[in-house]
A protein has these predicted regions:
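Residues lining hydrophobic/aromatic ligand-binding pockets adjacent to catalytic sites
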Residues: 1-150
Length: 150
């Protein structure tokens, strides 16, 4: 059985994020933010990639798995109804526009040679983050894929 981890760095410092990923045995982080910049120190693409590399974890930005701007506002809302609409809209977006990217990642995970992988985004709560939709799309394509939310 393959495992896919997800993690949100919202309340973590770079060293805490690294420690949590290492404790889980993660070998590769796929940053699924559309834009890999952050106001949080150390969490933008270059610095984050450097920190992870020092800890033996590979970093890749997968822009195509990021949330389109028109859905981002729905995710930011405190409304569970808007979160559900955002998730449904993002699911449709993935299937209509990024199916090849999801299929390619699924193939990587299914063949058993991919490094132990975590999807990374900002949001602490996976239930209100698009990374859960990406993970769900992957479980539909990879038999036996288990998702662990850190």
């Amino acid at each position: 059985m393959s495992v896919l981890w997800t993690i949100g760095y919202e309340k973590l410092r770079p060293e805490s994020l690294l420690a949590e990923l290492q404790a889980a045995g993660v070998e590769r982080v796929l940053d699924v933010r559309l834009r890999p910049q952050s106001r949080k120190p150390g969490m933008s693409k270059t610095r984050l990639g450097g920190t992870l590399a020092l800890g033996g974890i590979a970093y890749e930005h997968r822009r195509e798995l990021g949330t389109p701007p028109e859905l981002r506002e729905l995710y930011r809302s405190a409304s569970s109804e808007k979160h559900a609409r955002a998730a449904a809209g993002f699911r449709e977006h993935l299937e209509a526009h990024e199916r090849a990217a999801v299929d390619a990642l699924a193939a990587e995970l299914a063949d058993g040679t991919a490094p132990k992988t975590a999807l990374l985004c900002l949001e602490e709560d996976h239930e209100v983050c698009h990374r859960s939709v990406v993970a769900e799309a992957l479980t539909e394509r990879v038999p036996g894929l288990e998702v662990v939310h850190l």
